[in-house]
C-alpha cells in the first residue's frame, strides 16, 4: 500500500521522539523503523526521513515553524483560527502530488504564530540549514512560516544562511480548515522550486501565490488577500507554473555565501 507523507513524517512527532529517547536513555542519535528513520541535528531538532525515498528524485528538507499555513479553525472560515496547529507531516501531506516531484524530509522547528518567532528561532533556522546543507543528499530547503514576520525572517536568513542550495520560504493567508486554503499550493510550488537546479545561488526566496520574490526585498502588502506579498522597489524574481519556475530577475545585493555574517556561535542576537 502507498505510504502518505503524513505517515512518513507525522506519525511520530518530535515530542514523541524525544520522549522515547529519554525513556530508553539511548546514546545513539539515530534510530530507524520499517517506514522511516530519524536523526538529530546539533541543535536537537529531529529530522524524519522516509525509508522509501526515490533515488531519481531530488530531496528537499521542509522546516516548519507554524503560522497560518498550519492554522486550524471553523470549517470554511478564513478568520478566527488558531495558528500553529498542524505538524510538518500533515502540511506536506496536504500538498497533493508533492512526493512525485521530491523526497521530503520533515523538521518541526517550532509551531507558533509568526508574531512569536524569536531571534533564537532565526538562529536555529540558519544554523540548521547550514548544517544540513553539508549533506550531499539534500538538494534544497523550504521553511513554512507565518506571514506577519515572514519578510523579516527571510531578510535575516538571506544574510546568514551559508549555502548555494535553494532556500525557499512560504506561508498562507488562509488556515488549513478554510475553503480553498492557499497553503497546499504555496507549499507545493515552494518544494518544486527548492528542488529545481535553476534556483541555486539565488539567495533566500519567498514563494507566494505563484510569485517568486527575493528574501531581502519582499514585503507583505495585504492582510487579507492571498496575493499578499510583493517586492515594490526591485520587483519580483519570477513566477511558478505547475511546479516549474520562470525567472526574469535576479538578486543584486550580496546574500548567503557572499556575506560576512556568521551566527554559528550565537544563541541570541546582540
Residue ranges and their predicted role:
Residues 170-242:
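Internal gly/pro-rich beta-alpha loop/helix module
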